[in-house]
Regions:
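N-terminal membrane-anchoring alpha-helices
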Residues: 1-43
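Beta-strand-turn-beta hairpins that frame and shape the catalytic cleft
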Residues: 39-50, 144, 151-161, 192-193, ...
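Membrane-embedded segments
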Residues: 45, 50-145
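Active-site neighborhood of phospho(di)ester-bond hydrolases with catalytic His/Asp-centered motifs
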Residues: 51-53, 79-84, 109-116, 147-150, ...
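Solvent-exposed loop/turn segments at secondary-structure junctions
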Residues: 57, 85-88, 116-120, 167-169, ...
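Binuclear metal-dependent hydrolase catalytic cores centered on His/Asp/Glu-rich metal-binding motifs
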Residues: 122-142, 151, 156-197, 207-208, ...
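Conserved beta-sheet core of the metallophosphoesterase superfamily
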Residues: 203-282, 290
Length: 300
């Protein structure tokens, strides 16, 4: 290869790298709203939910004003948290998470399912001190209903919401740990077939187990959309437990009568990369009647 051709190749590579870095910075500081419609005969009246996951202390604008504005424009009946609103980091501030949730809780009912980062705060007080207790006190003070292997029934709408917190071994890297068929039942009990059952379950890898347990709708996160998504193909590249091209990376999945909406999350941690993979807020319309599903995107 001649010197002139080599210069051309180097220039092309440099331009590609600059473009990729620009896209990464752009995608790391924006989010889209994805809108889903789900119907079921057991739902008694329409309910609009916003689903937030994996914020990891990220701020969209001053005091998260862009995120708050987007949620206000949706005008939800409730907000469902699918875990990891904060990042488990020694001596980290709780301010970003608590400030956002305080502003939201003043307007909307919030049901909060833990992710592995909230769980980690409780497991390792030697590393995180009293962060778990302070966070719990803050959420109780502003009236957030935390669902830690518990459930709440919305009688008027015919909906039952469960929040699961599974053992840390199910978050191990480099593989998926087998889960006993009775494990979820031992944590959560048995769901009622008369209610439309929503399960907030941070880790999507166990979707088949959630379906077997009896969930009608699973709300998950954790994977961050695979961090980098392959253009055109749209597949996420790597999961937090270091598996390439994870099966469950983001979007809607169906298994039998069970659907899972897997949020691509809003923030980042450890490896702060989002490429072709902006943050995501889910807008979910739960409607009475027959089967219907759909989705749309709106950038923010």
């Amino acid at each position: 290869m001649g010197a002139k051709n080599l210069d051309v190749v180097i220039t092309v590579i440099a331009v590609i790298l600059v473009v990729l870095v620009w896209i990464m910075l752009y995608d790391s500081n924006r989010f889209v709203v994805r809108h889903y419609f789900l119907r079921d005969q057991r739902i008694k009246k329409p309910v609009k939910a916003v689903v937030l996951a994996d914020l990891h202390n990220k701020r969209y604008g001053k005091e998260n004003e862009r995120l708050l504005q987007a949620i206000d424009e949706i005008r939800p009946d409730m907000i469902l948290i699918a875990g990891d609103i904060l990042t488990a980091k020694p001596k980290a501030s709780l301010e970003t998470a608590v400030d956002l949730l305080t502003k939201l809780a003043g307007k909307y009912p919030i049901y909060y399912g833990n992710g592995n980062h909230e769980h980690r705060l409780k497991l390792y007080p030697e590393n995180y001190g009293d962060m778990a207790e302070r966070y719990e006190e803050a959420l109780q003070k502003i009236g957030i209903r935390r669902l830690v292997n518990e459930h709440t029934v919305l009688e008027e709408s015919g909906i039952c919401i469960y929040g699961s917190e599974i053992d840390k071994l199910y978050y191990k890297r480099f593989g998926i740990q087998p889960m006993d068929p009775e494990y979820l039942k031992s944590l959560l009990g048995q769901p009622s077939a008369e209610k439309y059952t929503i399960l907030i379950a941070h880790n999507p890898d166990y979707f088949p187990k959630y379906a077997d347990w009896g969930a009608d709708l699973v709300l998950a996160g954790h994977v961050h959309g695979g961090m980098v998504r392959v253009p055109i193909w749209g597949k996420g590249v790597v999961s937090p437990n270091v598996r390439l091209f994870p099966k469950y990376d983001g979007g809607e999945f169906t298994l039998g009568e069970t659907r899972m909406l897997l949020s691509r999350g809003l923030g980042m941690h450890t490896i702060p990369i989002r490429l072709f993979n902006p943050g995501e807020v889910l807008e979910v319309d739960l409607l009475p009647g027959g089967e219907e599903a759909g989705g749309s995107d709106e950038g923010k």
